């Protein structure tokens, strides 16, 4: 039975996780498809560019990665302290690099909040702060983007990934090194 990601990822126990995303329908993530001869190597650039953006936005540090022909591996570190130390302005600035910020939050940030907007804006900023340190949101922002680009390029719709990403807690330095060597 599938467990909720919140039951699988506990930054208090360990901040390090090995995450894996795998393609479906014999789709190619990167490299050359021997059957069609089509080269998908440029997709690695998409992934690296997106990972660079996510490193600037999230408080999740990328320790290692490997991009294979039909899947990828990431070793990440959830930096909870960094998320907690961000100012409200920094949270909004980071969040707005990936998502639209409601006008109400912009008004609040500029000091022009209407009655009742301040509490709602502060609740949204608190939610965004949590999400900036959430592996599921990090992976969502990576996988959705890559799937849309690949589907657009392939001229198709539907799933690009084999389902939810896989994640494994890395409990000690030995495990961390083993994942990074892979």
Predicted regions and their residues:
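Short catalytic/metal-binding and nucleic-acid-binding patches
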Residues: 1-182
């Amino acid at each position: 039975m599938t467990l909720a990601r919140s039951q699988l990822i506990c930054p208090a126990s360990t901040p390090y996780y090995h995450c894996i995303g795998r393609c479906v329908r014999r789709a190619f993530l990167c490299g050359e498809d021997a059957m069609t001869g089509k080269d998908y190597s440029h997709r690695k650039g998409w992934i690296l560019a997106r990972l660079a953006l996510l490193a600037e936005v999230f408080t999740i540090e990328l320790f290692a990665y490997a991009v294979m022909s039909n899947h990828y591996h990431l070793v990440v570190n959830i930096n909870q302290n960094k998320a907690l130390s961000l100012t409200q302005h920094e949270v909004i600035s980071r969040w707005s690099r990936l998502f639209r910020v409601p006008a109400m939050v912009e008004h609040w940030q500029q000091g022009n909040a209407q009655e009742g907007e301040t509490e709602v804006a502060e609740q949204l900023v608190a939610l965004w702060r949590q999400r900036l340190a959430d592996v599921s949101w990090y992976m969502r922002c990576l996988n959705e983007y890559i799937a849309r680009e690949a589907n657009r390029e392939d001229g198709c719709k539907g799933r690009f990934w084999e389902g939810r990403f896989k994640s494994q807690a890395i409990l000690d330095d030995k495990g961390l090194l083993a994942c990074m060597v892979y």
